[in-house]
Amino acid sequence: MHSDKIDEFLKKRKTADQAGGQDRIAKQHEKGKLTARERINLLLDEGSFVEIDALTTHHYHQYDMQKKKFFGDGIIGGYGVINSRQVYIFAYDFTVLGGTLSKMGAKKITKLMDHAVRNGCPIIGIMDSGGARIQEGIQSLDGFGDIFYHNQLASGVVPQITASIGPSAGGAVYSPAMTDFVIMVDKLGTMFVTGPDVVKTVLGEEVSFEELGGAMTHGTKSGVAHFVAKNEYECMDYIKTLLSYIPQNNTEEPSIVSNDDDPNRLDHNLINILPEDSLKPYDMKEIIHSIVDNHNFFEVHELFAQNIIVGFARMNGKTIGVVASQPLFLAGALDIDSSNKASRFIRFCDCYNIPILTLVDTPGYMPGTNQEHNGIIRHGSKLLYAYSEATVPKITIVVGKAYGGAYIAMGSKNLRTDVNYAWPTARIAVLGSDAAVNIMNRRELASSKDPEALKKQLVDEFTEKFANPYVAASNGTVDTVIDPAETRPMVIKALEMLSNKRDRQLPRKHGNMNL
């Protein structure tokens, strides 16, 4: 009886499924790119995607826009399941007017973000956009503003993840920057506020799309990209792995993943990772891999600010966030980028009930005019703020050097870290022994007949008196000195002890971190 209406509906649905049409889909494939719908189906469990607002269109007539109406209006979105966990998802569709954002497209995105917050589910955005739709003028800009506001509303409530698999320019770049994690696909994803043409016009500077805002640029230099994927398939794998470590929302804890790694496992070779000479570099990741479940560590921001390591792991099946000095780069010294990288990660962990394990081997903050003039004081203070603010369980282990302000900043007892351990190899002091002797004994060394022998003697005396873990243990700065072989079981026991931790901050609207 209603066959005509059903036929009309099926025709419209088929048209919506084809987005910008077969010709544009073919062009997308020729560029080596999947379509928005293909990307969503690749990420979600098979058959789980439920589309919302599939028949949306714009309502503009200027510039012959009435002839350029496509169902979906450049955004495909809805909800589905990833490894049996519900998520909300939207993807910019480059086959429809270059994936430009319209007023209706923005309404679709913010509707999905509202659903995600109300239902306590992660929200995932896939970027492939030419930016604002110029034909809609201020309405398109209003749309971006609404999205930014919703990014703020969702922040710290549900995880927000962005996949950059195409261009993002102008206003389109700020929403990804406000999300928790950004995955960029190498040679496909680009992000910049102003493109190469504008840069050339204004500054006379010749720069390619990749150099200005490609995945490697943002993965290694700006820090905008947390992960750089080789292709779209690896990008989706990053998202799936990331979701496996984090909870659905801020009221839940991450899922416990059972495994066969003995929580009491010892590693008597762990101490051998550290060189006898404390000035020689070593790879802190070897220590991390040794102590976590099944030696699996999911590193975040691997290519950026490599003098500090952050990422996720599990201890006895429970997710933890790891923050660690990396002596292989800048001797593990803290600088502007590493301070920003670590403080951002710590705050994410605190938002989503993820305990923080800190491994320390740092000689201090990076010196020099470049660091001072670019604000190491301001940026370095973020790390102090992030640790102090975090109320999740916090465990710190000093494995090597811990000098000066950097010692305090790296999860010290003074910042209300719950458990502080030190290895016998730890050196906790205001300064390294060599630098301290140079300052305190300058006159003696200058007048000595054998300054080298005297300096060695003074350095040894300073180390014995001050730069060792036992002085710190004697005054409670660290809770105890532990056998490195027992690091894994000691951390797991501490996590179990802290599993019911309740820590409340003083009432306030919000703190004022020195951004």
Task: List each language-model region with its residue ranges.
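Ligand-binding clefts of soluble mixed alpha/beta catalytic domains
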Residues: 1-515
